[in-house]
């Protein structure tokens, strides 16, 4: 099986990320699911992967550039997977070990030092430990983890696509 060109693959990766972000916005504004700090961090990482893919598709680099974008996309996707993995881990903690709930992120950005707010965004709060939605027995953070791992593998696959 031959892969489409690297440019086409990067564009498809970008479109998949855009669909993930559109789904997140749909669940927030139509489904009434308010995102927790880790959910917002995951959205930022999906956006970062999307921007890497879009830059690669627009730039249309030669072999070395394709490999650089492939590694960058994989690294960013694995960073997102680590955030999703922490979120899934928080969901499976016993109730007595769940961190305390904190104020909303907009309040934290206005009233707390930036470092404390970023720490809350990356480590999660008690809000991150409740399951509001499942599909096929998996929570939304578990599905996002699967998507990040798939995006990372898809990006890394472009390494070999650069040889064509």
Swiss-Prot record:
<feature type="topological domain" description="Cytoplasmic">
    <location>
        <begin position="1"/>
        <end position="9"/>
    </location>
</feature>
<dbReference type="InterPro" id="IPR023380">
    <property type="entry name" value="DsbB-like_sf"/>
</dbReference>
<dbReference type="InterPro" id="IPR050183">
    <property type="entry name" value="DsbB"/>
</dbReference>
<feature type="topological domain" description="Cytoplasmic">
    <location>
        <begin position="62"/>
        <end position="68"/>
    </location>
</feature>
<keyword id="KW-0249">Electron transport</keyword>
<feature type="disulfide bond" description="Redox-active">
    <location>
        <begin position="101"/>
        <end position="128"/>
    </location>
</feature>
<feature type="transmembrane region" description="Helical">
    <location>
        <begin position="143"/>
        <end position="161"/>
    </location>
</feature>
<keyword id="KW-1003">Cell membrane</keyword>
<comment type="function">
    <text>Required for disulfide bond formation in some periplasmic proteins. Acts by oxidizing the DsbA protein.</text>
</comment>
<dbReference type="GO" id="GO:0015035">
    <property type="term" value="F:protein-disulfide reductase activity"/>
</dbReference>
<keyword id="KW-0813">Transport</keyword>
<keyword id="KW-0472">Membrane</keyword>
<dbReference type="GO" id="GO:0006457">
    <property type="term" value="P:protein folding"/>
</dbReference>
<dbReference type="InterPro" id="IPR022920">
    <property type="entry name" value="Disulphide_bond_form_DsbB"/>
</dbReference>
<comment type="similarity">
    <text>Belongs to the DsbB family.</text>
</comment>
<feature type="topological domain" description="Periplasmic">
    <location>
        <begin position="86"/>
        <end position="142"/>
    </location>
</feature>
<feature type="transmembrane region" description="Helical">
    <location>
        <begin position="10"/>
        <end position="26"/>
    </location>
</feature>
<dbReference type="GO" id="GO:0005886">
    <property type="term" value="C:plasma membrane"/>
</dbReference>
<keyword id="KW-0560">Oxidoreductase</keyword>
<keyword id="KW-1015">Disulfide bond</keyword>
<keyword id="KW-0812">Transmembrane</keyword>
<keyword id="KW-0997">Cell inner membrane</keyword>
<dbReference type="InterPro" id="IPR003752">
    <property type="entry name" value="DiS_bond_form_DsbB/BdbC"/>
</dbReference>
<feature type="transmembrane region" description="Helical">
    <location>
        <begin position="69"/>
        <end position="85"/>
    </location>
</feature>
<keyword id="KW-0676">Redox-active center</keyword>
<keyword id="KW-1133">Transmembrane helix</keyword>
<feature type="disulfide bond" description="Redox-active">
    <location>
        <begin position="36"/>
        <end position="39"/>
    </location>
</feature>
<feature type="topological domain" description="Periplasmic">
    <location>
        <begin position="27"/>
        <end position="44"/>
    </location>
</feature>
<dbReference type="Pfam" id="PF02600">
    <property type="entry name" value="DsbB"/>
</dbReference>
<protein>
    <recommendedName>
        <fullName>Disulfide bond formation protein B</fullName>
    </recommendedName>
</protein>
<feature type="transmembrane region" description="Helical">
    <location>
        <begin position="45"/>
        <end position="61"/>
    </location>
</feature>
<feature type="topological domain" description="Cytoplasmic">
    <location>
        <begin position="162"/>
        <end position="164"/>
    </location>
</feature>
<dbReference type="GO" id="GO:0009055">
    <property type="term" value="F:electron transfer activity"/>
</dbReference>
<keyword id="KW-0143">Chaperone</keyword>
């Amino acid at each position: 099986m031959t892969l489409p060109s690297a440019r086409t693959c990067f564009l498809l990766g970008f479109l998949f990320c855009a669909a993930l972000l559109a789904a997140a916005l749909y669940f927030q504004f139509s489904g009434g699911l308010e995102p927790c700090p880790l959910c917002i961090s995951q959205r930022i990482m999906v956006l970062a992967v999307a921007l890497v893919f879009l830059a690669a598709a627009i730039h249309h680099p030669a072999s070395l550039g394709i490999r650089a974008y492939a590694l960058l996309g994989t690294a960013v996707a694995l960073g997102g997977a680590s955030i999703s993995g922490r979120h899934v881990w928080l969901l499976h903690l016993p109730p007595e070990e769940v961190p305390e709930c904190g104020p909303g992120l907009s309040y934290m950005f206005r009233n707390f030092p930036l470092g404390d707010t970023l720490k809350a965004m990356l480590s999660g709060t008690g809000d991150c430990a409740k399951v509001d939605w499942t599909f096929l027995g998996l929570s939304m953070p578990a599905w996002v983890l699967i998507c990040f791992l798939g995006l990372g593998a898809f990006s890394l696959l472009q390494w070999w696509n650069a040889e064509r």
